[in-house]
Curated annotation (Swiss-Prot):
Highest taxon, organism lineage: Bacteria
Alphabetical UniProt keywords: Exopolysaccharide synthesis, Nucleotidyltransferase, Plasmid, Transferase
Swiss-Prot/TrEMBL catalytic activity: alpha-D-glucose 1-phosphate + UTP + H(+) = UDP-alpha-D-glucose + diphosphate
EC number: 2.7.7.9
UniProt-recorded name of the protein: UTP--glucose-1-phosphate uridylyltransferase
Length: 301
């Protein structure tokens, strides 16, 4: 294997409308909805930074200015917190502030699909491999999924995707990969199928919204015809790229919550709250009481 090029940059698409969360997302971007006390998009940024990413490219759209503000300095707020003696909160805000020049924003002017959103980052990524994190998919575990992708990428190079296992009967809901030869940090991908027909999935490993892709994907996406939903689909582009470059998959050892769905969003809030040292115990007691009360009502019905 040739020496792999360092992955320094990550793309985070944040241009979606969040219609599944209306009316909450009428004025607030879905990426700014909170899991406990930080917005969904912050989890993706933290995961990327923990994996060694140096520069993050947000692909945004109109009415998303609040995302830029979130990752900017807030001197008035810091001054107010300082006068109140809230040094712990100041430290937390300063820790999440990106270094100057390490965050860029570009626009996706029309909602033409994930593949098109990725293509919109081409000039800011340049001729480099890059990570791609879908912020709706929130990693929960001892380490983020991208860190594991980095391990696999340094082992095999090429293109790398994050996967998890679903129940076989649910494979038709996801993008599924076929499992090939096993390597230390994952396995080779033999095929990729978007939402296969029932009983036709090559495995039960589904794509969990984390990728490391080579820059050749941009030229493919530039000329790709529209696919499902009349949109430019990333999976279609990856299928074309797989004809000339290798793909490997890293099975994530944690769990990914789909926070683009109401169920996944609620589950993520409960999971992250339970894991918190400051509120975990009391949340556990509250959730347990609610579950027991709910079960009692069901039995009494």
């Amino acid at each position: 294997m040739d020496r792999v090029r360092t992955v320094r940059k990550a793309v985070i698409p944040v241009a979606g409308n969040g219609t599944r969360f209306l009316p909450a997302t009428k004025a607030v971007p879905k990426e700014m909805l909170t899991i406990v006390d930080r917005p969904v998009v912050q989890y993706a940024v933290d995961e990327a930074r923990q994996a060694g990413i140096e520069h993050i490219v947000f692909v945004t759209s109109r009415n998303k200015q609040v995302i830029e503000d979130h990752f900017d300095d807030a001197p008035e707020l810091i001054s107010s917190l300082s006068r109140s003696g809230k040094s712990a909160q100041i430290s937390e805000l300063e820790a999440m502030l990106p270094a100057a020049g390490s965050v860029s924003f570009t626009r996706q002017q029309a909602p033409l699909g994930l593949g098109h959103a990725v293509w919109c980052a081409r000039d800011l990524i340049g001729d480099e491999p890059f990570a791609l994190l879908l912020p709706d998919m929130v990693s929960f575990g001892a380490r983020g999924c991208v860190a594991g992708l980095m391990d696999l990428y340094h082992e095999v190079g090429g293109n790398v995707v994050g996967v998890e296992q679903c129940a076989p009967e649910e494979a038709s809901k996801y993008g599924i990969v076929g499992k090939g030869e096993t390597v230390r940090h994952g396995f080779s991908v033999t095929e990729m199928v978007e939402k296969p027909a029932a009983g036709k999935a090559p495995s039960n490993y589904y794509l969990n919204g984390r990728y490391i892709l080579q820059p050749e994907i941009f030229s493919i996406l530039a000329h790709q015809t529209r696919g499902a939903g009349n949109e430019i689909q990333l999976t279609d582009g990856m299928l074309t790229l797989s004809q000339s470059q290798s793909f490997h998959a890293h099975p994530y050892e944690g769990r990914t919550f789909d926070c683009g769905s109401k169920q996944g969003f609620i589950e993520a809030n409960v999971a992250f709250a339970l894991a918190r040292a400051d509120i975990g115990d009391i949340v556990f007691e509250s959730v347990r009481d609610m579950v027991l009360s709910h079960e009692s009502r069901i039995r009494a019905a």
